[in-house]
Amino acid sequence: MKLITKITLIAGLGLGLVACENLDQEPYNQLSTEVAFKTVDNAMYWRNGFYKRLRDAAFYYATTYPELQSDLANASEDFGNRGGIIHTWNIEAGTTDVRDIWHRAYIGLANVNQCITKFPSIPTASANERTRLNQYLGEAYAFRAYYFFQLVQLFSPKYDPNGSNKDVANLGIPLLLTFDVTALPNRATLGQTYTQILSDLAQAETLLSNKAGAVGADTFTIDAVKALKARVLLT
């Protein structure tokens, strides 16, 4: 009888250990940050995601709405009212077309900020890997500058670096520079916003200095960064 009791107890302990082991698994549809930033290839996958999100329809319209509000675009008889609220200037606080641009931009910034923080700690085994990692980090800085620039153009008054609105509180945008789901920062000044944009572009220029422009390039190159910087300075 004692032998049967011992066997039962041992079998129960074995099943318990197996059960605990099976429960200790990563989610099948997501990765924790502890395992998502281990290799240069991981960084490449994150970087690919930057470009995928840029194609998001809600944020894409951020580049077209100013045209719809101007005389450069006019609705046809059968346009289906796509962008109609923007075209007719009937924008209200709850207009989803506008809300979604803000929302999608900050989703993109959350990913970019994660990478700007995490990429530098990824180990590299060769000069080639270090070059690749610097390129991906440079693209992350370029993306952050791009998002901030789009947002400040759409949601802030025109900036005059020598004017009276440079240091007025809350005329810029919230400058989220790290990933923090609890952060609720106030808007920065316009001066602070444009200083941050130019700072990020300077980082991108340094890190992408060896990535020459090419016809049909589909990622950030040094030429693209310089073109974006010129656009910012012309504002």
Regions found by a protein language model. Give the residues of each.
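Conserved, well-structured interaction surfaces
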Residues: 83-155, 188, 205-213
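Membrane-proximal, proline-rich intrinsically disordered regions
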Residues: 3, 20-69
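Sec-dependent bacterial lipoprotein signal peptides
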Residues: 1-20
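Short coil/linker segments at helix-helix boundaries
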Residues: 129-131, 154-195
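Alpha-helix C-terminal capping/termination sites
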Residues: 55, 150, 154-157, 235
